């Protein structure tokens, strides 16, 4: 193994990123314990290997993996291995076989289910139930989901936003724990029922369940009254210091806003992205793993939750949020994917939890810094298997990359794109040259980065003889001939921008919505060339 200054990255190819990210989810199952997925992964140091968790191995990873694998097949056409999916389906159902009406934790000594639920897992278990139904239409999903919803309605106090764990335990014999941030945090709204909103919305989309939609709306009301306030701030006294508690809730509220068109929800999300976001993150898309940290270890789950918020805000008409989404993709999420495993052992171990680690971990997302895989030389590097939010974020990006409304094609995210109507070649991938070819008569608009030289762009378009109109953040090209390829320079502006997070000073060189260099003196495994 070696630890070079720079690692190989991908900042342009969404399909490749999704394809590589599927790899670990097809690999890490414990054959000695009924194919239970692993949760914890450590690729450097003395704790090298994969490990189980009493809650997240059984209640979290199966649902998250099932949803991500099915979603990736849906948006890319990449076939889902049915053997792998059946392993996940087994656990999606198994955690509900303990007669407590909520997803159970597992005893790591006996590997039997416990009379115990980690309320954090409600969202991921519903992701799994939804994916199982979409994949093979198993109607057991509806019976389980409706029982969960009824249980939450019975024991959750919507006035004060608290779970009545005592009454629930008296009725079922099951303890409610808050392993997400420690037992004392079990009544935190964000990391339990707040994050459940997204799972309910995904389930509603397959079931049209009135109970699911009602519960999602009631929980969102609690969120708006107690956590997602008008001022948009991130207050750890309300949310807990672990941002994933909050970001996972925000992505769920964005899903609800999308299906309802509720502008109150969109405006609260927008307020957070303009205020609270900068308490936990920077424009590149990096988000701290925990606000109590003094180092720069982040978490891709957090980044991709907020990416999804940006995508749905963009869809709602706030076009600047498509720019923020592309900056997050190109500036952090894509380059942070583990594609270069030169620093990870690929030894053959008898213990399958360590065997051929480098090959089987490739494609994972984890806890990156703004500049690389490693915080400081010698820091432990981990890719825990709940960080599959990276796949979900990429899949949602594919969905929003190009959209069509009222016979107008919108290029929202400037990645290469091709279908039966259009072929688009991105200037980021082709030396600043944008090319477009219509295969059917369409009106077209392309989102403009705020870092583009409009004067030069107009000169380029005039030189090319292209009829155009610029309105706000959009370049309209409504008179293109079918079958003709139009190519012109898309003149991005380069800008060095400094960010201060706590006591850390970070400088990045932007070109359009991508990063081409960064400050990283003394660091290893870096994503970007060091600023000169």
Region locations from a protein language model:
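Glycan-recognition and catalytic cores of secretory/periplasmic carbohydrate-active enzymes
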Residues: 1-532
């Amino acid at each position: 193994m070696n630890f070079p200054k720079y690692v190989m990255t991908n900042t342009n190819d969404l399909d490749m990123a999704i394809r590589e990210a599927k790899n670990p989810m097809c690999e890490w199952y414990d054959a000695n314990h009924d194919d239970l997925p692993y949760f914890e992964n450590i690729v450097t140091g003395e704790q090298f290997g994969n490990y189980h968790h009493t809650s997240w191995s059984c209640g979290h990873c199966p649902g998250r993996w099932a949803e991500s694998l099915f979603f990736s097949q849906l948006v890319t056409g990449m076939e889902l291995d049915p053997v792998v999916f059946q392993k996940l389906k087994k656990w999606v159902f198994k955690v509900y076989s303990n007669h407590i009406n909520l997803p159970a934790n597992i005893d790591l000594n006996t590997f039997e289910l416990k009379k115990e639920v980690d309320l954090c897992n409600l969202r991921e278990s519903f992701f799994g139930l939804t994916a199982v139904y979409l994949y093979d239409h198993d109607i057991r999903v509806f019976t389980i989901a409706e029982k969960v919803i009824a249980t939450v309605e019975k024991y959750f106090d919507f006035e004060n936003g608290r779970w009545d764990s005592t009454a629930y335990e008296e009725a079922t014999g099951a303890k409610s724990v808050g392993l997400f941030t420690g037992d004392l945090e079990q009544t935190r709204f964000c990391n339990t029922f707040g994050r459940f909103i997204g799972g309910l919305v995904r389930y509603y989309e397959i079931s049209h369940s009135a109970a699911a939609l009602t519960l999602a709306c009631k929980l969102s009301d609690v969120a708006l009254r107690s956590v997602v306030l008008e001022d948009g701030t991130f207050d750890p006294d309300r949310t807990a210091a672990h941002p994933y508690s909050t970001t996972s809730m925000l992505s769920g509220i964005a899903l609800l806003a999308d299906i309802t068109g509720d502008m109150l929800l969109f405006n609260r999300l927008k307020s957070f992205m303009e205020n609270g976001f900068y308490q936990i993150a920077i424009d590149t898309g990096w988000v701290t793993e925990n606000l109590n940290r003094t180092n720069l270890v982040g978490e891709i789950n957090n980044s991709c939750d907020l990416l999804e918020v940006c995508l749905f805000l963009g869809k709602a008409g706030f076009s600047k949020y498509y720019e923020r989404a592309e900056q997050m993709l190109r500036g952090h999420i894509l380059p942070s994917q583990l594609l270069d495993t030169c620093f990870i052992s690929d030894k053959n171990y008898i213990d399958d939890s360590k065997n051929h680690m480098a090959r089987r971990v490739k494609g994972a997302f984890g806890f990156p810094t703004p500049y690389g895989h490693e915080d400081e030389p010698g820091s432990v590097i981990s890719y825990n298997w709940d960080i599959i939010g990276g796949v979900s974020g990429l899949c949602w990006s594919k969905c929003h990359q190009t959209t069509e409304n009222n016979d107008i094609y919108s290029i929202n995210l400037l990645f290469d794109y091709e279908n039966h109507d259009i072929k688009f070649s991105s200037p980021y991938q082709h030396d600043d040259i944008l090319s477009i070819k219509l295969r059917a008569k369409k009106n077209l608009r392309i989102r403009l980065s705020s870092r583009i030289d409009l004067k030069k762009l107009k000169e380029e378009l005039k030189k090319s003889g292209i009829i155009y109109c610029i309105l706000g953040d959009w370049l309209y090209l409504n008179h293109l001939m079918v079958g003709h390829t139009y190519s012109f320079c898309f003149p991005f502006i380069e800008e060095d921008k400094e960010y201060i997070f706590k006591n850390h000073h970070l400088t990045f060189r932007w070109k359009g919505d991508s990063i081409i260099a960064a400050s990283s003196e003394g660091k290893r495994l870096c994503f970007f060339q060091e600023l000169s």
